[in-house]
Each structure stands twice: as structure tokens, then as C-alpha cells.
Amino acid sequence: RRQRQMCIRDRYYDLGLVHRNETNDQVTVDSAEATKKYGVAVKCATITPNAARVKEYDLKEMYKSPNGTIRAILDGTVFRAPIIVKGVEPYVKTWKKPITIARHAYGDVYKASEMKIPAAGKAELVYTDEQGNESRELIHNFKGAGIIQGMHNLNDSIENFARSCFNFALETKQDLWFATKDTISKKYDHTFKDIFQDIYDKDYADKFKEAGIEYF
């Protein structure tokens, strides 16, 4: 019986700092789009430049993390799973099952806007809708110099994150634990919690019960 196979020609994208600088970081975007097209990629370690690297490599700008750029385009989830090898004993002997960490790959600090505050003044969050109406939220009344950072996320992306976590748990037969600082971040982090719970109740509660795993 002949097996059908699909072959993909190797495509190489140089994400070294020199080439990223030559392409104004377009090569990073191109590599992410290729990953979306072909559904698979292997990425080597890259450098996210700081001020010292900008000077060392004579960069045009302080480019953002290539990992962050790629993950944002893929709207993916980062799963950090242990590699279990016979003969390599776990540091905590009582841990008998693997622990996998899932992290949302879109938005947050990777897509944040930042500003240095030079002197006393007021910092606000401002949202302007398509009709020009504004909503304002005070961040802080500065008495002197400081810093601020603005982060965002998208409900659609959070929903995709939730489904990828639930599906991964079902595929690997692992309990899923949700963790966030919703007691402090009552809107930002709590939105994650609410979306996860809503999707679980509607689409995954019965599947988890059938698989013998739990969502906490």
C-alpha cells in the first residue's frame, strides 16, 4: 500500500541582528508568515537588543523581541513541557507527573507602549471610540520623574488561548490549573479568568469529565 507524503522544501530566514537590521526587521515578519502558511517551523536562539546591543551592532533602532513578533502574528500559545528521560531523576522526587506551563503569546508586555515621565504631571489611559467619544482612567499623579507602561489584549486572542489550553489538556490527559492575579487586576486579569470559565462551561466541561481530568 503506497503512503501519500507531503514534502516541504526547506525555507531559511536569517534572524541574526545584522540581517534584521538590513531588512528593518521585515525578515522576522516574513518568517512568521511562512510559519502560518506551512504550519511548522524550527527557530534558533535570537538576540533581543538592548541599548548596549544597539551601539555594538550599530542598529537603526532597538528592535523588539523576534519571539514576541512571531508569536503575535501566529496568535499562539507557548507550552513549556518537560523532557522526560529515563535515568534523569526529577529534582522533586514526589512529582510523578509532568508539569506543563502554558503562556499566552499575544499582547501584554511584548506589545506594550512605554514612556519615561520627565517631571511632575498626570498620566491617564484614554480610549476614543469610532464616534470620537473619550473614556479616561487616571494612572497616576506624578510628583516627579517616573515611568509608565500600557498593555493590551484582545478577547478573540484570549479565547484562542483558552481553547488551545483546554485542547492540550485533553490531548495529554493533564489537569488544567488557571492562574492569574485577578484579585488585584480586576479588569485585565479578571477578563482572562471570565473568558476561560465561560468557554470551559460551554464547550469543555463534559469532555474533561469524560477524560477523567479537571479544570481548576
Located regions from the model:
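Active-site rim loops that border cofactor/substrate pockets in soluble metabolic enzymes
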Residues: 12-19, 192-216
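Short, small-residue-biased leader/transition segments that mark boundaries at the very start
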Residues: 3-8
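Active-site pocket-lining segments that scaffold enzyme catalytic pockets across diverse folds
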Residues: 152-201
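Short glycine-rich or small-residue beta-strand-to-loop segments that form or flank ligand, phosphate
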Residues: 1, 43-45, 102, 148-152, ...
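Generic secondary-structure signature for well-ordered alpha-helical cores
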Residues: 37-40, 72-79, 104-106, 110, ...
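Internal alpha/beta core interface subdomains
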Residues: 102-172
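N-terminal glycine-rich phosphate/adenylate-binding segment common to multiple enzyme folds
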Residues: 20-130, 134
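Solvent-exposed alpha-helices and their adjacent loops that cap or buttress functional pockets
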Residues: 33-36, 90-95, 140, 169-170, ...
